C-alpha cells in the first residue's frame, strides 16, 4: 500500500510553507522508496484527527507530527526506513537533544521572520498562502497562523516587528494621554509616523535581541556540523538533518523585504548556509505551486493532486472555525484531538457522523448568508431603514453631547 504524506502546499520555491512539513518531506526523500509514497498538498488540517499537518495516511490510519511519523515509518518498515539506525549511543543522545533544540528555537525564528515581521508577512507569506488555499481558507488560515505565531513569540519582547501592533499601541497611548489631559492641545494632532520612521526605530530597538536569538540557533548547529557532510556523521544523514533542512530552508530561501534571518545565516554561519543549500537541492529540489496540482507527476518529488474542494469541505471549514472560536467548545475539541494522535476513522464514535452532518448544514448556511446578506439589507422595508437611520443619528448626538460635557469639565 502506498503511503500518503499530506502537507501544507508549496511556497518560496520550496515544497511546503511549513518547516515540519519540509522536514518530513526531506526524511521521506532520504529513506522511503519513491514508489512507496505520494505527496499531497492538501493544505487542510481537517484531514487529520489532531487537526495538524504534516500527516501520513496509511489506509484508514492517520499519523501526524514529524517525530510521530518518523517512529511510525520505523515500525511500518521493520526498521528499514530508519535514518537513525546507524547512530551510536552518544550520537543518538545528540540527535534527540539537537532535534528538540532545532524545533523550539527554529519555530520561534520562523514565526518572527515570516509572520510577526509585518513587511514579510504582507509581501510574501500571505500571498503564498493565497496561492495554495481555496475559499474560505485563504482568508481564515493566514490570519489564524499569524495570530498563533504572535502568541508563541510574545514572551520574546519583539512585538515591535509587527508595525501594525506598534502603531496601534502608540495610538492607544496617545488617546489615553489625551483623555488624562497630559498633552497640550497644540500637540494633539501631530502627523502620524511614517512606515520608514517606524522601520528605523523598530530595527534599532530589535537588532540586538534578534542577533542574540539567531546566534543561539545557528552557531551551535555550525559547530556540530564542523567539516562533516551531515550533522552527526560523514557518511549518511539522520532525522536531525531533516529537521535542520526543514527549518533553515525557510530562513535561507524566501525572498522577503526584510531578510534579517537570511542575512544572519549567511554572515554568521556561512558553512551552515552552504550545507542547508546543498541538502535542500538534494532532498527538496526547486518547486512551484503548479507542481503540486499538476495531473502529470514529475520532478524530484512524487506529487499527487489533492482532492477538489466540495461544499461539504467548505461547510466543515466554516463549522470548525466557528467551533474553535467558541471558548468552551474549542477546549473540548482540543482534548478530543490529543486523546488519540494516531486516529483510525474506522473506530471513530458514531457521533462524528452527526458532527459531519452538522458541519455541512452549518457551513452551507453560513456560506449562503455570506453571499445573500447584502441583498437582504437592500430588501428591508423603508420604515426599517428609516428607523435604523434615526437610531444612528441619536447615537451620534449622544456622542457629541458627551464630548461637550468633557470640554466643559476641562474648562472647570
Regions found by a protein language model. Give the residues of each.
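Juxtamembrane amphipathic/hinge helix adjacent to a transmembrane helix
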Residues: 266, 273-346
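GST-like domain detector, emphasizing the conserved glutathione-binding G-site
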Residues: 2-155, 162, 311, 315-412
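Alpha-helical recognition domains of nuclear gene-regulatory proteins
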Residues: 27, 72, 98-101, 217-220, ...
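GST-like fold's C-terminal all-alpha helical module
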Residues: 116-271, 276, 330-333, 337-364, ...
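Short amphipathic alpha-helical interaction elements and helix-loop-helix interfaces
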Residues: 34, 75, 79, 224-227, ...
